[in-house]
């Protein structure tokens, strides 16, 4: 019982320390210091064909997280015709397979290592295939006049199954804030 509890705690700690892989790219010729206002590209989002992403609760959580993050940086939400930049987003869930090599050390015939020839190799390897899901959030920021991309932020992480709605919302907020941490970029 103690082993199971300890294992559960270790798994919880490791999964809690999971970091989102964030990348961003932008137009280095763009003057980001002039950006003050923003608006959503579409009032009605259809961010994915996956029903786990394309539902009202997830869409609202992502939008709220984006707006909170941008407002904390001093950006003001406005109408499309007055915005300095527009925001669009997309989400995806991919099925992935990870191959792990497992090395087994065992003693022959149940006698333990003291009763065998030390020259006899008791090491064996096996490959375990583990399926998992990888989630991606992509934010595109566009110039409203030319409709060209000025900044893109991408966040990816392994999806943890069986989370409560509140935990999913918290993870989405964390992902959005980490992705938008690189916006506006510091151009050198």
Q: Model-derived features: where do they sit?
A:
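Bacterial N-terminal signal peptides that target proteins for export
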Residues: 1-6
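C-terminal motif of bacterial Sec signal peptides marking the signal peptidase cleavage site
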Residues: 13-16
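C-terminal/domain-edge helix-coil "capping" segments
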Residues: 18-30, 125-188
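Post-signal peptide N-terminal segment of mature Sec-exported envelope proteins
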Residues: 26-46
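Extracytoplasmic
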Residues: 35, 81-86, 132-137
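Structural recognition of the beta-strand scaffold that forms the well-ordered cores
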Residues: 39, 86-89, 149-152
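N-terminal segment of the mature soluble domain
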Residues: 42-98
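Surface-exposed short loop/turn segments
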Residues: 90-148
